Amino acid sequence: MSMKEFVQKLDEIQASFSSHFPLVIINSNYKIDNGIVIFGKKGWLRINESVPIMINYGSLILLDTPKNYMVGVYKNVNGGRKIKSYSPSRSQKALNNPSKIRTKQTNNDTTIQQSNNTTSTNTKPSSNTNTQQ
């Protein structure tokens, strides 16, 4: 495929790419492996061949136009594509939720009480457990 068609595909998936650098000239020893994926706002593009690259100021620049690639579009789910992410502070709040801890403790207390009720028929073992503690 030509460079124009490739850039049109990147534009279709709304990928962020820079046109300030020419995609030629530099002899670079770096090459991306097969299977690199470029994610955009509306879709993704997977390059299925080895392509020379240059990395400049945190940007990935392709030095050759890939000829073999696949394009996909995200499906709309409930009006949009949503990715759920958890921040460390949010996960800590979920772990330290007092209502969850209380319910677990009350469940444990009831099981302990039930076991104490079964041993309370024998008075000697219950007194032995008190002396051991």
Curated annotation (Swiss-Prot):
Region (Disordered): 82-133
Compositionally skewed regions (Low complexity) per UniProt: 105-133
Originating organism: Acidianus bottle-shaped virus (isolate Italy/Pozzuoli) (ABV)
Protein's UniProt name: Uncharacterized protein ORF133
Biased segments, Polar residues type: 86-100
